[in-house]
Amino acid sequence: MRKLFVWAVFCMVASLARAQEQRSVVQLVTDSGVVKIVLYNETPLHRDNFLKLVRDGFYDGVLFHRVIFGFMIQTGDSLSKHAEPGKIYGDGRYESYKIPAEIHYPEIVHRRWSVAAAREGDENNPQRESSMCQFYIVYGKRFNDDMLDEEQERLDRETGGTVKMTPEVREIYQKYGGTPHLDGQYTVFGEVVEGMDVVDKIQRVETDDNARPVGDIRILKATIVE
């Protein structure tokens, strides 16, 4: 009887642990394919805000308004739902609130396929608060040791030496690639778990001089699937 009781307690604890580790998944149906994003529980403010916007249909119809080959693809500006040809989007002036930064470096970094919040620059936003709605998906590139040394020098200049790459972080960028120069400065709140080929396809499209795709690429529908 005692063994059964102990086993029942063990099962209950294991079940609670799984529930705590369960992560929300959002599906983005784009006109280039389907992308699934898992949201990190380590960034609850960004997670909950993103889920609310998805439930409200905020992202349905928005453009990928900024695409840079070998770097990232950016979306989330609701003004782009009725985009004018050639117009620049993403300045964020209409946004009604910001999200406090939830930067967890070096545990969470800008490895390839990461999802991070866009924001205003440090000059106007020293607290590095995030945009209420705009986000980007990291593509980046792979690095060797010499390249990572250069990236560390860049980080030192931009952060006053406060962001240092650990051996584990360097290994991530050597193995998977990404954008290390953004680490410690932007909130990474999720990652792509399906549809990497779609992200790769989008980051290769032709763009104008302002990094807007020549042919509009949209999120047709965003839904919570888990």
Give names to the regions the model predicted.
Residues 1-4:
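Positively charged n-region of N-terminal signal peptides that target proteins for export
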Residues 17-226:
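Cyclophilin-like peptidyl-prolyl cis-trans isomerases
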Residues 7-19:
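Hydrophobic h-region of N-terminal signal peptides that target proteins for export
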